[in-house]
Amino acid sequence: MKRLIAGAIAAGLLAAATPAVAQEKLTVFWGKGFYKAEDDALFAAVKKFEEKTKVKVDISQYSPQEMIPKTVAALDSGTPPDVAYGDVFDFQVAGKWAFEGKLEDISDIINPIKGQFEPNALATAFLYSDKTKKKAYYAFPTKQQTMHIQYWIDMLGQAGFKETDIPKTWKEYWTFWCDKVQPAYRKASGSRIFAIGHPMGVDSSDSFYSFLTFMDAYNVKLVDDNGKLLVDDPKVKQGLISAVTDYTDIYTRGCTPPSSTNWKDPDNNVAFHNKTSILTHNATISIVSKWVDDSKNATLTQEQRDQAAKNVKENIATAGFPNKPDGKPMVYRAAVKVGVIFADSKNKARGKEFVKFMMDEENLTPYVEGALGRWFPVTKKAQDSKFWLEDRHKKAVHDQFKAGTVPFEFTKNYKFTILNNENVWAKAINRVVNEKVPVDKAVDEMIARIKQVAG
């Protein structure tokens, strides 16, 4: 008996000394949403994956400005996440990382389901690796965005104008807001608001997306379909001069807050929500989606929820840009948001499993729609969902995308991700408004940098 007891005690001590088998972990870096519903949609998908696989997802969320530095730091330290998604990866790093051989080829995930996606979404994820000397799917597409204009209908009314008074032509449109609406509203309200929240910060993706839209208004093409630069064409230079002139003119006329030269991505939203600006151009409808989220937020008072609902239904308009200076309708560039798996990730097998799970229509669509219209789907089926016809804001987004979009330069020449990361566009804008450099000189500097980087 003593021997049995001693054996049992020894076995117990051995068991106590042996650590429990650790739960398998997947490390994920993911961009933080702009409001609660967006993050809740992500967490719901993560929880579903955890329940299915019994794998713990260790998720770290970062703002657009933090996401790339945090990911680069992890890469440099030799501990990259197993999966990473950032709202500006497509603009600034995915093409460069693929070229440098830092990304895992995930064609085995994308190829079997690529018929579900629209072509532009696939083009953004189909990247060239200088290591393999070929293109492959080195990223996974999740959702997309394009440029919209949003304005306060009630503030426009307080200034004494109706929506039908808004011009449809380019020059007249901006003049209307700056020279008519702004002074009229200031006089009527006694408050020093600004007509336009105009992003110009170098540390902002909004600023270069907005500027490139002004560039598109002048039909400027910086690269051909093979990625060859076209900036030596005198027409391209003149178009850039016109775009920079128009973009900086809004600032020099005192039509946007002085602080907008330093704005980061959320700041034009904040100015709009605070009603210190009447209009802003934004590359998603996150502005109205924030009020949709507030209208359903149980932590707010009923009065606050009712006001949020009224803002969505009555007070905020979602619209497209005016016609281009040549009189033709604006053609919008779409940016497809992508995530990646790194070649040096420690748990690539589970990382691929997570990506495959997220790419499944029944998981991807609720995640995208959970952002309440901030992002538009990249799958054909989800684009035809009744969700996009539920209100006038989402319908406006739906109609813009269905009218056709064009891709960014970086889908043809990956080195434009470097130029976007530097934000040569906002640097030129700030040279003009802060350093009083002539527009043509700022454009010459911009062109020289484009040729140096992407030539």
Regions found by a protein language model. Give the residues of each.
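Extracytoplasmic "Venus flytrap"
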Residues: L26-F43, Q145, S205, N413-T417
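Short, solvent-exposed loop/beta-turn-alpha elements that line the ligand-binding surface or hinge
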Residues: D105-N120, I166, Y185-R186, F194-V202, ...
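Extracytoplasmic "Venus flytrap"/periplasmic binding protein-like
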Residues: E24-T27, A44-T124, G157-G160, D165-K168, ...
